[in-house]
A protein has these predicted regions:
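Extended, non-catalytic subsegments within catalytic or DNA/protein-binding/adaptor domains
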Residues: 1-228
C-alpha cells in the first residue's frame, strides 16, 4: 500500500542519517487528496462510547478475579479513555509523570507517535461527577493498591491493553471483533465531539497534529444530528 511504501522510504532515510516526517501536514494532505480521488475502504474498528464504557466498567466490577486486577483494569480503561491515549502512551506512563491536583490529575506524555522530537505534552484529566467511572479516583485507587512509587504504573505491553479491552468488551455483550486497543482513544474523540467539543480542543488532548482524523470522529458523532 501507499502507506507501507512511505514507511519504507522513511526507513531508508533513517539508515542514511536523514529524518523524514511522514506525518508532515503536506504529506498527510496529499495522502488525503489521493483518498478523495481514488476512494478508500474504511475498515476501522468501532469506538468505545460513554455507554459502552459504563457497561465495560460494570462488567469488571462483577468479574470473578482478584481485587487488585479489577482495580488495575479499571484504571487502564478509564484513564486510557478519558485521556485519549494511544496504547503506546498508556503503557509508558511512569509514576513520576503523574501529578494529582485539586481539579483532577495531570499526566505528562514524554513521547508519542506524532511527537518525534520528544517535546512531550501534558494531559489534564478532570474528576468525573459519577465516582464509579472517575479516572482520577480509579488511578488513585490503583496507586494505593499496587504500592507503586516509581517506574511504569501499569507495567504491561501495548498488546496486553488490546487484549484487556477485547476481554471486557466481549464480557459486556459486545462484538469483540469490532473493537481494538485504539477504541478507547477514538471513543474519547467521538464522545467529546458528540458533546460539542471544538476540533482544536480535541486535538489538544489527543495530540493529533492534523485535522483529518479528528474530523472523521466529528463526522461520526454528527451522523444522526440534523439528519434530513
Amino acid at each position: 500500500t501507499l502507506k507501507r511504501r512511505i514507511a519504507s522510504i522513511s526507513v531508508i532515510h533513517k539508515m542514511k542519517g536523514h529524518y523524514l516526517d511522514t506525518k508532515h501536514p503536506i504529506i498527510m494532505e496529499n495522502l488525503h487528496g489521493i483518498k478523495r480521488v481514488k476512494g478508500t475502504n474504511q475498515s476501522s474498528k468501532k469506538p468505545i462510547l460513554i455507554n459502552d464504557l459504563k457497561l465495560i466498567i460494570n462488567v469488571i466490577d462483577e468479574e470473578n478475579q482478584s481485587e487488585k486486577r479489577k482495580i488495575r483494569d479499571r484504571a487502564i480503561i478509564l484513564v486510557g479513555f478519558s485521556g485519549g491515549f494511544r496504547r503506546s502512551e498508556l503503557v509508558n506512563i511512569e509514576y513520576e509523570d503523574v501529578e494529582f491536583v485539586t481539579e483532577g490529575v495531570k499526566i505528562f506524555v514524554k513521547r508519542s507517535k506524532t511527537d518525534q522530537s520528544g517535546e512531550g505534552m501534558t494531559k489534564a484529566i478532570p474528576h468525573f461527577i459519577n465516582s464509579n467511572y472517575c479516572p482520577v479516583k480509579s488511578l488513585n485507587e490503583w496507586f494505593n493498591k499496587s504500592g507503586i512509587k516509581s517506574g511504569k504504573i501499569f507495567n504491561i505491553s501495548d498488546k496486553s491493553v488490546a487484549l484487556i479491552i477485547k476481554k471486557y468488551v466481549s464480557l459486556a455483550g459486545l462484538d469483540a471483533n469490532k473493537y481494538a486497543g485504539h477504541s478507547l482513544r477514538s471513543g474519547f474523540a467521538t464522545s467529546t465531539a458528540d458533546a460539542g467539543a471544538e476540533e482544536r480542543n480535541i486535538m489538544a488532548m489527543t495530540g493529533h497534529k492534523t485535522t483529518q482524523m479528528v474530523r472523521r470522529y466529528i463526522q461520526e458523532a454528527n451522523l444522526f444530528k440534523n439528519n434530513a
